Amino acid sequence: MYTGVEIDIVVADALKAYTTYQEIFTTELIEKTDFPKGQNEVVFTIYGTRIHLLDENPEAGMQAPKDTIVPIWLNVMVPDIKETFKLAIDHGWKELMPLTDMSDFGVINAVVADTFGYQWMLHQIHKEVSFEERKAMFEQQMDD
């Protein structure tokens, strides 16, 4: 018996989406079908998080995003944000937030939108900052 969380994502073409994601992130393939478009699925992990891509199939009630970006993002902590960001842009992803160095918080962030309608926050931690320290910094910013 398995327990855990799996993120299921409906896209226009699961096989194409997986090819793109594996070229940008470190992935581990679990299973992948090779059926006619509309019937495929790919299960894989990105840094240990299980993701399940499914082809859009309106007859089965599975709709991929259309012309709008879904208001949820996947936050991926990567070892080299500049390289990952460049790969995403090179694959036609749209920059929503540029590389932003938040050195006081110990991170560099960026947000990109993939060509399938989903947002990805890229996140590189370069210094461990405790919750208490981050909270105090936010409170100080709110007081200023």
Task: Tell me what each language-model feature is.
Residues 1-8, 25-79, 85-113, 124-144:
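Vicinal oxygen chelate
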Residues 17-21, 88, 117:
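Conserved active-site tyrosine of GNAT-family acetyltransferases
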